[in-house]
């Protein structure tokens, strides 16, 4: 389950209902979707071949079909990051700066973990996401992302239109201080 980390001196938020409420009040959609048991053979592997990525996506297609019908998403892919990915640090450097997109950034974490940071109306906070977490960052929301110390994540990315996913960087620090 996700954990919210706020400014120093404020306790983290760990209870699922409180996490949902905190994020909902800020316009961020969050849910906890259990990864199907029949996907464990693929989610447990560190490295996936392209054919295995597609197989895993198909095992998760019930979520995609629901999002297509309710939210208009048109495509999805699976990003698999781990310490052995060539150029991992360069890839991550694109996302750990504060930026926004003109479309939602929608992720379903099916293995591993990472951290989204947000700047909303002068408030900064982190959302540590883990397996089974679903998060939708609203369009035009200043945020950043980085992997936690485990440096491992598998996430389904859902898109309405790929052109809306280009990062637009802003002059803002990603520090909670």
UniProtKB/Swiss-Prot annotation:
GO annotation terms (biological process): L-methionine salvage from methylthioadenosine; L-methionine salvage from S-adenosylmethionine
Ligand binding (Ni(2+)): 99, 101, 105, 143
Presence of keyword Transport: no
Cofactor: Fe(2+); Ni(2+)
Pathway stated in the Swiss-Prot or TrEMBL entry: Amino-acid biosynthesis; L-methionine biosynthesis via salvage pathway; L-methionine from S-methyl-5-thio-alpha-D-ribose 1-phosphate: step 5/6
InterPro entries: ARD (IPR004313), ARD_bac (IPR023956), RmlC-like_jellyroll (IPR014710), RmlC_Cupin_sf (IPR011051)
Enzyme Commission (EC) number: 1.13.11.54, 1.13.11.53
Keyword Iron-sulfur listed: no
Catalytic activity reported: 1,2-dihydroxy-5-(methylsulfanyl)pent-1-en-3-one + O2 = 3-(methylsulfanyl)propanoate + CO + formate + 2 H(+); 1,2-dihydroxy-5-(methylsulfanyl)pent-1-en-3-one + O2 = 4-methylsulfanyl-2-oxobutanoate + formate + 2 H(+)
Annotated Fe(2+) binding sites: 99, 101, 105, 143
Function field: Catalyzes 2 different reactions between oxygen and the acireductone 1,2-dihydroxy-3-keto-5-methylthiopentene (DHK-MTPene) depending upon the metal bound in the active site. Fe-containing acireductone dioxygenase (Fe-ARD) produces formate and 2-keto-4-methylthiobutyrate (KMTB), the alpha-ketoacid precursor of methionine in the methionine recycle pathway. Ni-containing acireductone dioxygenase (Ni-ARD) produces methylthiopropionate, carbon monoxide and formate, and does not lie on the methionine recycle pathway.
Assembly and oligomerization: Monomer.
Family listed: Belongs to the acireductone dioxygenase (ARD) family.
Protein name: Acireductone dioxygenase
Source species of the chain: Leptospira borgpetersenii serovar Hardjo-bovis (strain JB197)
Species classification: Bacteria, Pseudomonadati, Spirochaetota, Spirochaetia, Leptospirales
């Amino acid at each position: 389950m996700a954990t919210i980390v706020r400014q120093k001196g404020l306790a983290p938020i760990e209870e699922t209902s409180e996490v949902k409420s905190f994020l909902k009040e800020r316009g961020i959609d969050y849910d906890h979707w259990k990864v199907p048991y029949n996907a464990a053979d693929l989610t447990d592997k560190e490295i996936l071949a392209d054919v295995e990525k597609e197989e895993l996506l198909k095992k998760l297609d019930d979520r995609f079909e629901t999002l297509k019908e309710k939210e208009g998403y048109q495509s999805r892919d699976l990003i698999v990051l781990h310490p052995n990915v060539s150029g991992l640090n360069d890839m991550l450097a694109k996302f750990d700066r504060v930026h926004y997109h003109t479309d939602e950034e929608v992720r379903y974490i099916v293995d591993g973990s990472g951290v989204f940071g947000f700047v909303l109306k002068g408030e900064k906070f982190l959302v540590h996401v883990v397996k089974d977490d679903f998060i939708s960052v609203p369009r035009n929301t200043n945020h950043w992302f980085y992997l936690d110390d485990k440096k491992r994540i598998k996430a389904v990315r859902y898109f309405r239109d790929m052109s809306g996913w280009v990062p637009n960087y802003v002059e803002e620090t990603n520090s909670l201080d």
